[in-house]
């Protein structure tokens, strides 16, 4: 693995990717399968990387997150919560016990999948940005439980969530909480620097929201993302270092 290519969201001084043979994490599971593990999670993109949400913004959202957390809703667990509320078959699936031994990565963060269920995040932490390890030095070894891989269910779950007329009581309860969290994410975590917005408008043009919608259609948004990646981006493990006040995305 490589353990120095992405220094916690800071793109300034970022070097080219050089993969190493050293193990970074040791992962064991009761039911081995594929997961995407998250460690450091940035919240707001600036020209030079990711940063945490402004304290004033978090303070203003404190009542919202108090209510969500008291009701068992955490942003780090939206996928398993959605699957359990919207798909009856999920409740019949066995949970997977996962043990992480952190050999060389930052021990301040727990490395967890989107399907995380066995580690209750801090109820007093506003913003739900990743899962922070306990202790001054973090944690090098820990165990949690997770649902089976749920990423593959994402299209069907979003379709069920959108079909509001056919949601049962459990689905409606999840939908209500998700809507409040969704609004916070859109207002807080999806802001882009003006330079990026300008370039994207040149590529994709202007857009308008459909009547009654609070955000752009997910299917069309995905198509736009794939279009930009395939037509305007070239994969490279070499990094051109930033100079001056250039934006990492547009440089």
What are these regions (language model features)?
Residues 1-251:
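Helix-boundary/low-complexity linker signature
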